[in-house]
């Protein structure tokens, strides 16, 4: 099985100058990095445009090769293509229509994902409002978004259901902005040793970091 997880807004906050914590927010990920092949990635987009990262990851095509008028391929390009290519089709060619499946714990029409994933040849795009919809969709404390733990459970269900190899795509939602103070007993409020931030910036940072810790 090959599972590609695009973890919403994930980064290592300990690498940002001026940002520090008295405890490591992502110790498990750091430990895994130390014992296996790992590295750093420079994102081609910041502050929005999740679907553009998705498009580039699934197709291997950089937005830099397109004209500047192409802002969001998921909305402007893929719906108008006859046979758009994506990596999942390698599994489809070998195992048939159910060679690839996708999960996004939000709404299917966002960025026209329901149209695009069908064009790419995924057997389903399983969302909050799709048919079939995702089974696991609990949130954490006051967060409006499905937790990463629940999102992973949906992927595990697909792995256990299918006997042959498949390509599974997951785009998570837990750490999506805005970063309102929605986690109860957030230990990173006390562990935040960063300096020079406004009250709003501290709240955003500490909520975001708690989300990363939950992902970890």
Give the ranges of each region predicted by the language model:
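Solvent-exposed soluble domains appended to multi-pass membrane proteins
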Residues: 1-7, 12-216
């Amino acid at each position: 099985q090959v599972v590609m997880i695009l973890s919403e807004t994930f980064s290592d906050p300990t690498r940002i100058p001026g940002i520090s914590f008295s405890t490591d927010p992502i110790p498990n990920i750091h430990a895994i990095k130390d014992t296996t092949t790992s590295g750093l990635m420079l994102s081609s987009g910041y502050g929005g445009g999740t679907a553009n990262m998705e498009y580039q990851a699934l197709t291997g095509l950089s937005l830099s090769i397109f004209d500047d008028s192409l802002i969001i391929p998921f909305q402007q390009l893929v719906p108008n293509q006859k046979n758009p290519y994506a990596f999942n089709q390698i599994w489809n060619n070998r195992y048939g229509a159910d060679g690839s499946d996708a999960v996004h714990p939000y709404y299917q029409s966002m960025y026209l994902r329901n149209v695009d994933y069908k064009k790419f040849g995924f057997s389903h795009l399983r969302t909050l409002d799709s048919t079939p919809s995702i089974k696991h969709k609990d949130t954490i404390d006051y967060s409006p978004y499905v937790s990463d733990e629940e999102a992973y459970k949906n992927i595990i269900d697909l792995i256990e259901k299918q006997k042959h190899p498949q390509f599974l795509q997951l785009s998570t939602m837990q750490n999506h902005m805005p970063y309102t103070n929605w986690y109860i007993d957030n230990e990173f409020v006390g562990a935040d040793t960063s300096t020079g931030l406004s009250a709003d910036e501290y709240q955003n940072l500490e909520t975001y970091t708690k989300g990363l810790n939950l992902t970890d």
